[in-house]
């Protein structure tokens, strides 16, 4: 509650559209000992937040959040290096009427071609990316996408396949979660 009030005051607003539990080790639920979900639900009833959402880096917690039906959206690491499990999360969100917010769309800086990443992300149904920019060149590429668009061409598909062959598996997304 205190964090929410601080956010409202700092943002100089009466409400927050999407209030996210950021990377909890568990899936907050009504009646939980932690009181997190109950506090968010009360704030929603008071009109201080519009949607309760969650971010996570753990597949099990993310899946539990989807299955719970309690959340408006899930924010999770997602790039064109995503495997079957991550793709299943996207589909789970879609079928449960939840939004999917992709973080780490450049795989924590591992990917270098922002135009290809943006073109791939644009064809993913029910996915909205939050682009973390680590280099000025990435910003330039994303701004180019806004101006010109980015089509998923055969050349970009080949880049994706090459990167998947070379980079997939256990790789660091640069999120610092393991620290």
Regions found by a protein language model. Give the residues of each.
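Structured C-terminal cap/extension of enzyme domains
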Residues: 88-102, 106-179
């Amino acid at each position: 509650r205190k964090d929410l009030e601080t956010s409202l005051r700092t943002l100089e607003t009466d409400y927050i559209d999407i209030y996210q539990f950021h990377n909890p080790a568990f899936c907050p639920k009504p009646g939980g000992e932690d009181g997190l979900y109950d506090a968010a639900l009360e704030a929603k009833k008071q009109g201080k937040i519009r949607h309760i959402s969650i971010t996570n880096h753990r597949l099990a917690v993310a899946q539990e959040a989807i299955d719970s039906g309690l959340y408006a959206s899930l924010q999770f690491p997602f790039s064109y290096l995503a495997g079957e499990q991550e793709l299943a999360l996207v589909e789970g969100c879609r079928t449960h009427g939840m939004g999917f917010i992709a973080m780490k769309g450049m795989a924590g800086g591992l990917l270098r071609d922002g135009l290809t990443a943006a073109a791939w992300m644009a064809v993913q149904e029910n996915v909205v990316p939050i682009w973390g920019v680590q280099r000025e060149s990435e910003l330039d590429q994303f701004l180019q996408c806004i101006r010109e668009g980015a089509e998923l061409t055969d050349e970009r598909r080949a880049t994706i396949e090459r990167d998947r062959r070379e980079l997939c598996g256990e790789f660091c997304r640069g999120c610092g979660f393991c620290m």
